Amino acid sequence: MKEKALILVLDDDPDICIMIKMVLDYYGYDAMDAENEENAIKIILSNHVDLVIMDMLLSGADGTDICRRLKLDKETSSIPILMFSAHPTAKETCLAAGADDFISKPFEMNDMMEKISFFLERKKIGQE
């Protein structure tokens, strides 16, 4: 039996983490959350994380720096990263940092789920 995909939600707002995790659970995914870079890296390196969803702006950290770090590391470079922000010019910044895609806040959960499904399916095909 195939395991459920594991998705890491990285945001310093616990309410957003809870909301996204509830939606992911509803759609049959396993989800973990982290509120900072240190916890996120520990989770990614100690679990088989299939996708990361993260805010561009975090307390004490820049999501784009975390994204760059993950994409430059051989162990984590293949993990799809979906970033989000309410900042008007954030999309270009996030994509330039290596994010695989971007969602503007506020976002519709259906839009987020479509992007997640796309990246997980693409990753699955690449592993076959």
Describe each region flagged by the PLM.
Residues 65, 87-103, 111-114:
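Alpha4 helix (beta4-alpha4-beta5 surface) of REC/receiver domains from two-component response regulators
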